[in-house]
Amino acid sequence: MKKGLKLLSLALVLTLLFSCKKDSEGTPATSGKTAKFTITANGVNSSDDYVSFVIVGGDTKGTKTIWKVNGVTRNNEAAISLGKDDFTGSTKTYVIETVLPVDVITTSVQSLNFNASYQISYKAEIDGKVITNDDGVTVDVNKDYTHQFDY
């Protein structure tokens, strides 16, 4: 009985000793990715055209302030939406960037035309690499620009 108890104790000690693992000495890798979108629309008519750019990002922490637009941080906004009225004034180009690394990004783009044509450009850079670069796309009554991208 004593011999069995000693063997069991020894087995328990050895199990505990070898099941403990040394902590990693390196710092954990930063997760997430950075993004920069450049969107231009020229010739948009607010009464005849439909333009919609929606960019949504998120991280695992539920951070709400994700984006800056043309250098201005958009507090408490995880999504940015641009419509036809954003392109009929003096600003025709918008640069939308993450203010911190995010885990998921999705974009939805729809440009329709019902009269005179207009041009759009959509460029997506993820971690500094150009992923999508549709430059000078003409949108007219026969050709729309409708896409959904996940990065």
What are these regions (language model features)?
Residues 1, 7-11, 47, 99:
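Low-complexity, intrinsically disordered regions enriched in charged/polar residues
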Residues 3-7, 13-38:
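Bacterial Sec-dependent N-terminal signal peptides
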Residues 28-151:
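First exposed extracellular module after export/assembly in secreted or surface-exposed proteins
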